[in-house]
Amino acid sequence: VSTITFDVGSATISKYTTFLESLRNQAKDPSLKCYGIPMLPNTNPNPKYLLVELNAKLSSGEVKSITLMLRRHNLYVMGYSDPYDNKCRYHIFKDISSTTERKDVETTLCPNASSRVSKNISYDSSYPALENKAGRSRSQVQLGIQILNSDIGKISGVKSFTDKTEAEFLLVAIQMVSEATRFKYIENQVKTNFNRAFYPNAKVLNLEETWGKISMAIHGAKNGAFSKPLELQNADGSKWIVLRVDEIKPDVALLKYVSGSCQAT
């Protein structure tokens, strides 16, 4: 399993770009493309998982780190680890329910059996579950490099923290890592607002919820036209009707796996 590292504490726009590009390259199936957009692999790829190490720098100069574990075929975050008390502490989402997968998370995040300790996440990985614990919806949770940096500092190596603190960190990390890897539009929102905190707009939130639908539509398009119009949202929340691949292609970096052939170019 490969680890992609991102130094949040010394991040620049170009370093963030490079980070997302390497994540996309590690995640995608090298042989699958629709209309020039790379696609993620089917459900059982090798390697199956990806690790993303995020390093924060606190105002004291101290470096704190958190490693996220992602399912390669859909970029869902399964859990994370942090160094705690000279051990590797791992945290697994409640909805990772199969014993095999839980074991995988544990051994992939913390390979050394003699120095690992568990601190489970008591809720599911879905946005509604995370928003519930954070006490507000994603539209009210600010994103940004400084926020990600300080959120890591509130959790990494810290003995105890609330579900709220943890869920806020996860909402920020999932959107700035997984969602930005899937969507160029979300990557560009982070870059446009790089040195300030920002609230995700309606288009960001809508893309996050329609990735599967968008992937299916692009995969099924004939000569660049969708079989039926795709109803999405603009940044201001107004209706955005998409009829052709070209109209949404600039916003999409990776397609979710869809079986069967598609037009490659």
UniProtKB/Swiss-Prot annotation:
Glycosylated residue positions: 120
GO terms for MF: rRNA N-glycosylase activity; toxin activity
Catalytic activity: Endohydrolysis of the N-glycosidic bond at one specific adenosine on the 28S rRNA
GO biological process: defense response; negative regulation of translation
Cysteine disulfide links: 34-262, 88-110
Family as reported in the entry's similarity comment: Belongs to the ribosome-inactivating protein family. Type 1 RIP subfamily.
Name of protein: Protein synthesis inhibitor PD-S2
